[in-house]
């Protein structure tokens, strides 16, 4: 499994934004990352200043890199329906909120909680609890 470092993740987002603004072609995951960045105009200024934000620690505030990385993970899960049933659960969220970004953020809450619990418990993520969370938010 590919596990990029904090620096690699940040450089990917900075590079994606730089290429987009320069009109350069994007490759691979950069295309998906750009879609996420475009959903978050509040991050554009930060992404345009890598020298200022590259090494910043986010302790008491929302970490934009973590947020966008969770978006990437969720988009990948949806594209392959893994865990099985996530795509159907997301469609229910989409129907409920009638807004793609709002539905994604509802799902991100469940993903973040699942990751947090797995790290806390030093265990694998609980797919059943993850899907249950999505279903609860969709109802």
Descriptions of predicted regions:
Residues 29-94:
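Aromatic-anchored, charged helix-turn/loop surface patch used as a conserved interaction hotspot
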Residues 86, 100, 123-127:
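Residue-level recognition of alpha-helical structural elements
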Residues 111-112, 116-119:
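Amphipathic alpha-helical protein-interaction segments
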Residues 120, 124-139:
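Glycine-rich, aromatic-bearing surface loops/beta-hairpins
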């Amino acid at each position: 499994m590919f596990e990029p470092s904090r620096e690699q993740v940040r450089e990917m987002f900075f590079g994606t934004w730089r290429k987009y603004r320069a009109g350069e072609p994007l490759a691979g995951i950069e295309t998906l990352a750009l879609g996420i960045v475009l959903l978050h105009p509040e991050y554009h200024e930060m992404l345009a200043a890598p020298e200022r934000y590259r090494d910043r620690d986010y302790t008491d505030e929302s970490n934009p890199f973590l947020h966008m990385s969770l978006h990437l993970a969720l988009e990948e899960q949806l594209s392959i329906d893994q865990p099985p049933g996530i795509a159907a659960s997301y469609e229910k969220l989409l129907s409920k909120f009638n807004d793609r970004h709002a539905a994604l953020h509802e799902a991100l809450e469940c993903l973040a909680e699942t990751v947090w619990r797995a790290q806390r418990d030093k265990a694998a993520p609980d797919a059943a609890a993850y899907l249950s969370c999505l279903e609860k938010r969709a109802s």
